[in-house]
Structure formats: C-alpha cells, structure tokens
Amino acid sequence: SNHKKRENTRFIKDDEKFDEADSNFERKQVEYRKKKIQKLTPSFVKKEKLKKTSKLDLLFVHPLWGYLFFLMVLMVIFQFIFSFASYPMDWIESTFLYLSQLASDSLPSGVVNNLISQGVIPGIGGVFIFIPQIALLFFFIAILEETGYLSRVVFIMDRIMRPLGLNGKSIVPLISSLACAIPGVMSTRTISNWKERLITILIAPLMSCSARIPVYTLLIALVIPEGYVMGFINIQGLVLFGLYLLGIIGALVTAFVLKLIIKNKAKGVLLLELPNLKTPVWRNVGFTVLEKIKIFVFDAGKIILAISVILWFMASYGPGDTIEKSSQNVMKSQRYLKSSDDEKQSMKSSVMLEHSYIGNLGKFIEPVIEPLGYDWKMGISLITSFAAREVFVGSLSTIYAVHDEREEKQKLRKTMKNEKRKDGTPTYTLASGMSLMVFYVFAMQCMSTVAVVKRETQSWKWPIIQIAFMGIMAYAFALLTFLILS
C-alpha cells in the first residue's frame, strides 16, 4: 500500500513538470497521464486465459461466422428431420390405413361404417402423423436451448429481424416452418412481445413446408421441361428453389406490412442474458418434447378431427339422389363393364366425388377460379386439400380415376397432360401449372395449422384474418402469374 501511495504521489507531482504558460500544456498533460495509466494498469489488472466456452462464443456471435455456423446447424437439423421422420410417419400412415380397412371390413355396411373408416380414423391419423416431425424438431430446439446456443442465435439475428417488425427469437419459428408450420407456430411462445409473436405466427405458414413438396414436384414435372441452364443447373430444381424463395420473400414483406398495420403501445425490446454454454439436461429435453406433443394432440387434434369428419361428409354425400343415379349410369357404361375391379372402384369414386357436395362446390367456384386457368376438377382439389396440402395429389388421383398405386404418379401425370378443356386446349399448361404452384406458395391450405394458430392466439379472429389475407395474396399472385405466362 505504501508503494501505491508513492506511485500516486509521483503521478500527481509529475504534473508540475509542465509549464502552464505553454500553449500545448493541456494536450501534453493528457498524453502524459495516458502513458502513465497504461504503465500502471498491468499491476492492477489480472488477465485470465480464455475458457473453451468463451472461445466458442467468439464463433457463435461473430458477425460473419456466427451466421454461417447457424446455417450449418439448421442444415444438420433438417437433414435429420427429413431423413428420420419419414420412417415413423410412413408407419403411422400405413397403420391408420390398415385400421380404416379393418373397420370397413368388420363393421356392418352403412353410414356408421363410412363415418368411422373414412372420417374418424383418417382424422385421428391426420393428427398422429405430425408427431414424428414435431417430436424431432422440438428435441433439437430443446437441446439448443439447454446448451445455451439458442440465446446466441437470437442475439445475432435480432439486428436483421427487428426492422421487419420481428424479433431475434422469430428466426427459430420461421426456420422450423420450412419443415412444418405446426411446430413453427407452437415455438413462438418464446417471444414475449405480443405484436412480434403475432406477426411471426401470421407469416409462419408462408414459409414453404414439406407438405407442399408433393404438389410442387407433380406440377413441375408436368409443366416445366427437363433441361439445364449453363450446362449444370437443373431447370426443374431452379423452379423449386424459386418457389421456396418466393415464400420467404413473401413472408418478410408481409411481416413489414403487418408491422405498420397492427398497433401495439408496448415496444419490443430484446432483453437477453447469455447463459453459460453447458451440456444439456436430457430429462428437461424429454419433458419439453412430451409437453409439446401433448399440447398438439389434445388441443389442435380436436379441431383437426372435427374438420376431417366435415370434409368426409361433404365428399361422401350429395344433394338428393344425384350420386346414386350417376353411379348407376356409370355402371351401365361399356368402359365400366370392361374394366377390372380396381378400375371399377376408381370410376365409381370419381363419379361420386364429382356429384358430392364438394364436387358441386367445385363447380360453383369454377367461375371464380377460371381466370387463374383452373377448372372445377382443380377446384375440388383446392377445397379438399384444405385438410392438408398433400391431399391435392390424392384428390386428383380420385378425380381422374387413377387406380394403380404402383404407377400412380406416372399415370396421373400422363392423364393430367392429356386433359382437355371444353374448347379442346390443354388444361395443364405452363401458365396454369405455374399459377397453381404460386397459389400453393401463398394459400393457407392446412387445417392443422389453422387449429394450432387458433390454439396459440386463443381466438378465431386471427386464424380467419390469416386465411383471408393469405387467400387474397394467393389469388392475386396466381392471377398475375397466369396473365404474364399466357
């Protein structure tokens, strides 16, 4: 302590060296003191070596490498989701198909049989089939959160998301929605500001999810010619990439517009404490996954099941005895009599669907969708695919009476390619095909997501608004696409 006092005394007395009459007195004094402080500082400051976790933070929050590392993490996560979720999803799908067939064979023929085998069981299956994706996604998100890395991601993304009316925490739900909007919407609970969370929920379905892939691949193969740009870039792959990019741009622009429309006095502030990096507590990870699955099954599942039964009823019944009469007429046709049992069943299903309530609704909306290049058959697919976007392909298979499951996609593509309008022109052209793809980029064609949005917002107001503005966007951009390419 005596040594420090002597140092301080010398430091003060050293100021007396300077002549106050000197015009540069103050500058010299400041420079001298700065040098003196720099000389004395090492004796007061204790330097410690960087810990391994601190070295990792230099990477995680780096202005450039932090973003690249995050993209790599996302790539690994979605590779796992797409690679491994498909196996249990296929098993769940085949199990519920078996249960539907078992119920159909075991129960007496009639309304109850059809309700259970074609409405209730497929509806429950429509809930359970999403569980593998939800479980895997929240498993990885829980790990990222438990380790402390997720807080770093939120920190680096906030500067990009905030001008759009979003929050750094919005990045996880939006990226999650590229796999499935359902877990994406559910993961917005980490966003504390109501306005930012609501905007994230409203734009999440605009991110192209995996359910859109069957629609995209069928239509791209149908209307986009095979070939390469610059000798190595696949044209069909380029169109697929463009559709994903269109969805992302649409989501971000919509977020900015909603930021200006939705009023909220509370300003969004990102208050974030970066926790220490650590190994995850697996018990907490498992609890998080189970909790998310439970919320989805018991809350959203009830609504999904109800809508499934409604869609089944509308597709199975029609006004008066039109279905019965049309079925009898087709059974008398020469084509029907010469067909195999599978072909006969497909033809009857096609005629029943055409004259059902949904078929009549498809014909009713035909004048509205005709400017987009669609006919009533596409209208039926648009309506039925509200249950889930991937239902689009199955609906077309039923409408066009494609019966051989082993070659379903090839036969469906060939049948659609040969489909003609009343004036003899092809139904599926580059203009109508691209218009349909753009429609699916923006349209809210997923009742499961609607159910989850209702659950998360605690109101039907926002799901209805979401369906409305996404429907308007889908119609407007599909119309623009058709007019440009016609």
Task: Annotate each predicted stretch with a short phrase.
Residues 1-47, 330-336, 341, 407-418:
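Alpha-helical transmembrane helix bundles of large polytopic membrane transport and channel proteins
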Residues 26-30, 41-54, 104-113, 274-287, ...:
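Short, membrane-interfacial amphipathic segments enriched in basic
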Residues 60-155:
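Core alpha-helical transmembrane segments of integral membrane proteins
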Residues 94, 98-102, 106, 151-179, ...:
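Juxtamembrane inter-helical linkers in multi-pass membrane proteins
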Residues 236-254:
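Alpha-helical transmembrane segments
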